[in-house]
Amino acid sequence: MELIIATRKSKLAQVQTEKVMELLKKKENVDSKKLLVMTEGDRRLDVSLNKIGGKGLFVKEIELALLNKEAHGAVHSMKDVPFELPSEFELVAMPEREDIRDAFVSLNGSTLSNLRKGARIGTSSIRRAEQLKLFRDDLEIVPIRGNVQTRIKKITEENLDGIILAAAGLKRLGMEDVISDYFDPKVFLPAIGQGALGIECLKDGEFNDYFKALDSKEVRTTVEAERSFMKVLNGGCHSLIGAYSEVKDNDLYMIGTFTVNNRIVKKDILGNKEDNILLGKKLAEKILGEV
């Protein structure tokens, strides 16, 4: 038997899927292969995501492959998965979470603190751009899209002083050496689910148990809390939303940020990790209470 796993065509998406394939072989002794899918988000690289429908554009065609029974499962970056799935699907596993931090990449090794006044920084993320302005309001934000390699090339092509990328993607691609600096995730909050992988299947799929065996309880605890936070705030690519969460013993600690009435609000919460979804909801309500 060979499971078919749908994924995007980018190098990073394929590397992430290969990690899941290795886990399937190691834990379940099951062979698998990739089904590469071109998504709308990959095709429309000329426009910011917030103008064309948000991050769901990276998953719709992949879900179609599942519906058409062309694949048994799909691997996503959890930060690309909308907070509400269509009723036919479920996230059966969240097998691992890499470094959750954002990373600063510059060709000369400059860090954010020693950049020249008015430096040009590339990012299309509202979350990154707005938080960046809190540190250095003199910086010029330049929208860039594309895969990791394309964005790094744009430092030279668009005369940028640096760009911001997820550390997880760079590490998975073996490109950690291009990182000039890391952002403290408790200060510069990551995207919801950043660094985590998710496996999506049709509900009650015949082979779902193989994928479920790869689930990490701790990863699921943090990511579900963050997604609960995002759901209450109805956040996506159109607004600043970020969260940091960590499990320590029986506790879950979360920090969240969101824009309320054009003001960036940041709050935290601590509680029992078994109440992760409730904690995410309460943190969102705490922020909305600032209205």
Swiss-Prot record:
Q: In which pathway does it act?
A: Porphyrin-containing compound metabolism; protoporphyrin-IX biosynthesis; coproporphyrinogen-III from 5-aminolevulinate: step 2/4
Q: What is its EC class? A: transferase
A cellular component term from Gene Ontology for this protein is: cytoplasm
* Keyword Transferase listed: yes
One Gene Ontology BP term is: protoporphyrinogen IX biosynthetic process
Q: Which GO terms describe its molecular function?
A: hydroxymethylbilane synthase activity
UniProt-recorded name of the protein: Porphobilinogen deaminase
> Which organism is this protein's natural source?
Clostridium perfringens (strain SM101 / Type A)
Encoding gene (name) = hemC
